[in-house]
């Protein structure tokens, strides 16, 4: 067989793959101006001022805004009942089960947050966000959908002033702590409270892009995008993000994580150092 032909065929196979592997982009709100970082899996490759023209699809982030509205307007809980009628229920619950608001946000259950199911009218929605000087894309239910393209700057603006964001941040900590995202919790800890998102890159059904958006522990808004799904982005770049994301110097009250570690792994015995003798219980 002609070896030149083989090499040529291999090049055709690998070139599209290489083209899809774009650097991770991280937008971070700054005191003077917003920063845009480009990262490889090994670290930062470029830092610049965030362009006003950089766009992103909303993806699953629209659910975060519905969640904020529900919380801020004190809407009663309306659990979604899974009946096995929709393939989208894979993000929600098993047939015969139900899902509530907080869990739906973490799992990205779009069926729960559907405005029609929650009886959210276009007028009440628009008035609510207009009063808060939200971007035009957020004040319209017709544009609150995954394919809507918005500027990253306007997205960061909306996150900076999002109602009920303290509650959202508390709930979204579970996204990073998800044991299915191997290595993410050990790298990022509780430094980020984010809603994941995924969509089609440049509207091409065969190419996925994803990431997340939310806040650092101190409330600083951030946005991330990369090739692949949000889970792929988190697991692939957790180490690189660990190097660039700031570590909080102070932890506010209420930001600790309650873990029932010893309920699952009870202690059998506590011994003194270099001894097999059990330590007797004592106070002080």
Mark where each language-model region is.
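Bacterial N-terminal signal peptides
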Residues: 7-14
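Active-site-adjacent helix/loop patches that line small-molecule binding or acyl-intermediate pockets
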Residues: 22-24, 28, 32, 80-171
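Extracytoplasmic
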Residues: 23, 31, 51-53, 57, ...
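Beta-lactamase-like hydrolase cores
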Residues: 15-52
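Short, hydrophobic/aromatic-rich segments at coil-to-beta transitions
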Residues: 189-198
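Bacterial N-terminal signal peptides that target proteins for export
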Residues: 1-7
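Active-site SXXK
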Residues: 55-78, 104
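Structured C-terminal helix/loop/strand segments within mature extracytoplasmic catalytic/sensor domains
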Residues: 20-24, 98, 115-123, 163-181, ...
